[in-house]
Amino acid sequence: SYIKGKVVAAALQNKSGEFLKPSVAAGAKALNGISLDKDLAGKNPNPTAKGAYPIATLTWVLAYKTGNGDNAKVVQDAFNYMLSDAAQNKAPSLGFVPLKGDILAKSKAAVNKIGK
């Protein structure tokens, strides 16, 4: 999430030379521009896109492909909700960046691999 309330955030310079304060829009430019590999690891922690905030990161959650037993469906349901349109549409009001495009698609595919 980004800074709210009476705290003043510093504007940081990104690789495009812009000075930006943290916001959902600037975070979205950064996070949704990350290219993920098959293990959902990104390679560019300092985005080059115009309008992208230079310090942004994803929240990582580890889940097992096997060994979940009877909890597998509950775990999948929880992650599927987090990645749903309903949850992603709430993200900005909570100070988080909604996931879109490749990151969202790869995250949903990873959830489908969670098994018993």
Where are these regions (language model features)?
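Flexible, solvent-exposed loop/hinge segments that line or gate ligand/substrate-binding clefts
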Residues: 1-85, 94-116
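Bilobed periplasmic-binding protein-like "clamshell/Venus-flytrap" ligand-binding domains
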Residues: 91
